[in-house]
A protein has these predicted regions:
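Perimembrane helix-loop-helix junctions
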Residues: 2, 152-161, 185-221, 291-296, ...
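Transmembrane alpha-helix segments characteristic
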Residues: 10-15, 117-118, 123, 221, ...
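Transmembrane-helix motifs of polytopic, lipid-linked glycan transferases
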Residues: 86-110, 148, 152
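Membrane-lumen/periplasm interface segments of specific transmembrane helices
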Residues: 19, 195, 199, 209-286, ...
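Short periplasmic/luminal acceptor-recognition loop of GT-C membrane glycosyltransferases, typified by
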Residues: 411, 445-493, 515
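Hydrophobic, aromatic-rich transmembrane alpha-helices
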Residues: 2, 200, 272-304
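Short acidic/glycine- and proline-prone juxtamembrane loop motifs at membrane-interface regions
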Residues: 56-59, 128-141
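Signature aromatic-anchored transmembrane alpha helix within multi-pass, membrane-resident enzymes
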Residues: 6-10, 191, 217-221, 296, ...
Length: 569
């Protein structure tokens, strides 16, 4: 067995683990969405009322479920949850998997070894890939699923193998359980498979194309139905992302976001984000497409359609006001560029396959003669490629694109430092290069963002020091997730996922509740269950509690906390 994929995976994993651990545990740089996933996973294992559905149904479950094996050790190593290290491990493994898939695509096409190494390294070392390969966010898992699906479909275009088609469907199904926007590449893949299957068949075209389409889409449909049905059975809402008080639609409304006044400006942001992440994509895309048409190479259509669907979906949702202006939403442009660079060199030979389909595209021999998966020498003859293009010209083009790819890395790094384009990434400069003497507004904002959740950790330490019995503190996790993961005793908190949360909230004295953690009843705080039950809790204790402590917040976008003591407790 070729050890190269294992080496690529191991090296990438170590890189992302070290980087992620340094940023989180070393520099306290924590992403809110990542930490909330850790909190949800912890609640499923170590809350007062541990159960799997505590991970919630607002967001897709796979990012949290993948962390369960690591969170299980947090009672012995609290830093796993306190610093979100379970998310770091999860993202490191899956981003390394995405890197390995890019390597595998080059190998499957028979690309020169130097090109495989260079393109894989450029992808793995992209600043956005490194950052999101170790911060616990869903991007790593989503990219892995997309790259896996792209690789398998690129193989299927050649092999017509059912194994490749089913694997691509599984990858897309898992992608949906990672991010809802995986439906976009799934739909694009369905159209692609139906069209390719219909065109290359000589008999029973429609029936065969429908069968191939069903094999691909079945795992996605199963994931969609099972997740929606489970959510409906447990919560009464099939799509909490859109209907829940905690869902994305509610978050947009509570945050004051809406449809942009000028859709053209919103589209310009999306284009700018893609150019930051993939500066050479406008050059590479038409060149790769033209070469594919000239060679009659159908493989480049796969990454163009699938990753293009992701980017188009993100652009559309931002233009219509359904999402935020986050640079990370356009990260699919990075693997798209890397894979297109690999397709500049014509494919050589044939990918190893366990079982070829009837319509396998094997150059120079029949499918039965190639069932062993051995490689054919390819289409190259003399100094020409299969398209008649001089081999030297293709090599020069690949070298030039590789140089441009390397040169694009600092462009992405500089773009990540833009306060306008990269609102979640630009604080990295303050994290990596602290400068107390810098008095600029930009640095002050970056430092405040970098300090996010520091107050919640101090609050958790204070509450731990009180040595309260289980179930003593009622708190919603809208903002409180950061307090929960930082506490050594999460069972002291009564949270919405607990089956008796409403009873404790309605009768705190009878249920042994001693404290209530309150946030302002404004912005996202309007969705806080405590504010919905007691609208004046933050202002005056709602006549059931007295103010014990007020905690001003050092972090950006975080509320000033108030700790109330329940009267009669």
């Amino acid at each position: 067995m070729n050890p190269a994929p294992r080496v690529v995976f191991a090296a990438s994993t170590v890189l992302y683990l070290v980087t992620g651990t340094f940023l989180t545990a070393g520099r306290a740089d924590l992403m809110g969405d990542a930490l909330s996933r850790v909190s949800a996973t912890q609640s499923a294992v170590f809350s007062r009322d541990p159960h799997l559905s505590a991970i919630g149904f607002v967001f897709t479950p796979l990012t949290s479920l993948a962390q369960l094996p690591f969170v299980a050790f947090s009672q012995w190593f609290p830093g796993i949850t306190r610093w979100g290290l379970s998310g770091v491990v999860m993202t490191a493994l899956f981003m390394a998997g995405a890197v390995t898939m890019v390597w595998g695509i080059g190998v499957d096409r028979g690309a020169p070894h130097w090109l495989c190494v260079l393109i894989t390294a450029v992808f793995a070392l992209n600043p956005m890939v490194v950052f999101y390969g170790g911060n616990g966010m869903s991007e790593a898992l989503f990219l892995f699923c997309c790259c896996w699906a792209v690789r398998r479909l690129m193989r299927w275009v050649r092999t017509d193998g059912v194994h490749d088609l089913v694997a691509a469907g599984i990858a897309l199904g898992l992608g949906y359980l990672t991010r809802y926007d995986a439906l976009a590449p799934a739909m694009a893949a369905g159209v692609l498979v139906f069209g390719f299957s219909y065109r290359r068949r000589t008999t029973q075209r429609t029936a065969g194309a429908v069968m191939d389409f069903a094999l691909l889409i079945a795992p996605v449909a199963l994931a969609f139905v099972v997740w929606a049905a489970t959510s409906w059975l447990i919560t009464g809402q099939a799509f909490q992302q859109f209907t829940s008080q905690y869902g994305n639609s509610a978050i947009l409304q509570q945050s004051g976001a809406g449809e942009p006044d000028h859709p053209l400006e919103a589209a310009q942001y999306s284009i700018g984000a893609m150019l930051i992440l993939a500066p050479i994509l406008p050059l590479l895309l038409p060149v790769a497409a033209a070469l594919a048409v000239r060679r009659r190479d159908r493989q480049p259509a796969v990454p163009i359609l699938l990753f293009g669907a992701v980017l188009a979906f993100q652009t559309l949702t931002y233009v219509t006001g359904s999402t935020f202006a986050f640079l990370r939403f356009y990260i699919a442009a990075i693997p798209l560029t890397a894979i297109l660079a690999l397709t500049l060199v014509p494919e050589r030979g044939f990918p190893a396959s366990k079982r070829l389909g009837k319509y396998a595209d094997v150059p120079g021999e029949s499918a039965s003669e190639s069932d062993s998966g051995r490689r054919d020498p390819g289409h190259a003859h003399g100094g020409l490629t299969g398209s008649g293009t001089p081999r030297a010209a293709v090599t020069v083009a690949a070298v030039l694109v590789s140089v441009l790819l390397i040169g694009s890395l600092p462009v992405t790094g500089l773009g990540m430092n833009s306060q306008l384009m990269a609102v979640q990434e630009y604080p990295l400069r303050a994290v990596l290069f602290p400068d107390p003497d810098n008095v600029s507004d930009k640095y002050a904002d970056a430092a405040r963002i970098a300090a996010t959740f520091s107050t919640e950790r101090k609050l958790a330490n204070y509450l731990d020091a009180l040595d309260l019995p289980p179930g003593s503190i009622v708190m919603d996790t809208v903002y409180g997730f950061a307090v929960l993961v930082a506490s050594d005793r999460p069972d002291r908190f009564v949270i919405p996922s607990d089956s008796d949360f409403v009873r404790n909230l309605n009768r705190p004295v009878e249920r042994g509740v001693k404290y209530i953690l309150a946030v302002p009843n404004t912005g996202r705080g309007t969705s806080d269950a405590i504010n919905r039950r007691y609208p004046t809790m933050y202002e005056n204790g709602a006549q059931i509690a007295t103010l014990e402590l007020e905690i001003p917040n050092d972090g950006a976008g975080q509320p000033d906390w108030r700790l109330y003591r329940v009267i009669g407790s």
